[in-house]
C-alpha cells in the first residue's frame, strides 16, 4: 500500500533538532512516500547531521529567508534536485531576546521588525521563491502558535504569529487560482530548541498541564508532524486558508 505522499516532492524548512516538528514532518513525509529537500540557516552542518537520522538521505541547502539572493536562486537549486515541488513546509520563527520574556512594552522597533520579517513575511517570500516549481498546484503548510491570546512571556512573537496567520489567509486567496492551498498547523508548546529560547517557557507550558482536554506531551512533536503531512497530502483537496489545531484541544477551552 502506497503512502499518502507517494510521488510528492516537498521542501521542508526548520529541521534543527530531532525534537522539532520539522524533523518529524520530514521523517513522516519520507515514510509516506515523499521525496524531500531540507533548508538550513545559519548552520547547514547542524541540519546535515540531523538529516542523517531520517529514513532516507536528503539534500540540505542553505537558505536565509531574509536574503533576496538566497531566495532568488532557490528555485534553480531545488529544480535541479527534484524537478519541481508539490509542497512547502514553513517552520521558521525568530525574535530577538529583547522581544520576548516580558519586555513587550520596551521592545525597540528594529527587534519587532526582525520578528515580523523572519516569522511572518517569510511565508510569502518563501512561497513566491518556490512558485515557479509548483506548476501543477500544491500545498503550503506553516506552523503557528495560537495568536488569539496574549500568552505569558511570548510577547512580540504573538503579533508575529498573528501576522503569519493573516498572511496565510491572503495567500490562500491569491494562490487558489493556481490550485495552491495554504494552511497552518497550530501546535501546542513543545520542548524544542526554539521553545527553550523563550524566557519563562515553563510558565507557558504549564497552561497545557492544567487545562488541555487531551493529555499534552511536551516531548512529542509527532502529532503536529502528522497534521502537517495530512495537509500536504491530497486528503484535503479543497481546504485552504485554514488553521488546524493540534494542541490537545486547549484552543476550545474558556477560562
Predicted features and spans:
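Catalytic loop of short-chain dehydrogenase/reductase
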Residues: 14-24, 93-131, 136-177, 189-192, ...
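A short hydrophobic alpha-helix cap/turn motif
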Residues: 30, 83, 134-135, 173-178, ...
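Conserved Rossmann-fold SDR core element
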Residues: 165-196, 236-246
